[in-house]
Each structure stands twice: as structure tokens, then as C-alpha cells.
Amino acid sequence: MSKTLQSFNLLKWIDENKELLKPPVNNKVIWQDSEFIAMILGGPNRRRDFHVDPSDEFFYQIKGECYVECITEEGKREVVTVKEGDVFMLPAMVPHSPHRVANTYGLVIERKRSQGELEDFVWFCDECNHEMHRVRVQLSDIEKQVKEAIHSFNSNKEIRACKNCGHIMPEEVEEWKCE
């Protein structure tokens, strides 16, 4: 199989493909035939899950700011602001929730998963930080599977109810507001 050896203008690609960047995740993979997952993500996204990826993730913020909410080893939430033009390398296995506001774009690169390599999508209570729900997947289609996991959580009131404090997370996710 021959691969195309050609560059292209990424900003033009983003402009021509904006309609593909839809909530909740707003992601579009650029190349299907690579050993990397290279995708453009736009804002505003509508997600509150924390992704636990077995590989590092490279963030390059093209326009605006991205807020990567991370869970530290001590269990605390910490927000990393990735400003326009900045890069950020997120280490493997750090639970993180990338938040994008309107009219922002970024590039995220991570490696494709090996057969049998699993990763998690985790939801924590907004009130007490208790783990509410966890989905473990063999990731093969990042555009499809992340949306399915988010939809499954949002549409099920039982798993949106915290068993620790009783808080019920709303079905609809509002745009991120950095506090």
C-alpha cells in the first residue's frame, strides 16, 4: 500500500471541516492510515468524563485556550491551561478531562492502542469527587466510542446519581467555565 507523501495546510483543513467538529467531543481524526491518532478538536465541547489513556497525549493549541482538568496522584482536581500556541505533554494514565470553549481549535496526538490494551472513561461527582461510573474499552474508533460512552452516561439517571452524597449530575452538560 502506498501512502501519500504530501503536506497540507492544517488551518485550511480546519476551516473546511468545522462542521465535523460536533459535541460532545468535537473531534475529527486527520489520518486513518497512521500508527498515531492525530485529531483536531474544536470548541465548545460538552463532556465531563475523565479519560485514562495508556499512552501519553500531545496537545498543541492552535486557536484560543484549552483547559485540561486532571486528577492528581493525591486525588485532587487540577486544571492545566494550554494557551494559543502552547504545547502540553500529558503523561500516560493521568485521568484528564479536556474542556474547550467556543471558537477554539487544537491538535491532539496519541498512539493507537495495541490489541488487548484497555483504557477507561471515568465520571466523578461534581459535589464530592466520588467515582460514579467507569467504562473500560479496547479503543478502536476514538470518534465513535468516546461519544457512545458519554451518551450512555448522560442518558442514564441511575449512573448520574452519586452513591456517596446523592447529587444527581444533570443530563445536559454546559459549556466549561474556568473558575
From Swiss-Prot:
Fe cation 1 binds at residues 51, 57, 96. The keyword Mitochondrion does not apply. Binds 2 Fe(2+) ions per subunit. Substrate binds at residues 57, 100, 110. Pathway: Cofactor biosynthesis; NAD(+) biosynthesis; quinolinate from L-kynurenine: step 3/3. Keywords: Dioxygenase, Iron, Metal-binding, Oxidoreductase, Pyridine nucleotide biosynthesis. Its EC number is 1.13.11.6. This is 3-hydroxyanthranilate 3,4-dioxygenase. The lineage of its organism: Bacteria, Bacillati, Bacillota, Bacilli, Bacillales. The gene is nbaC.
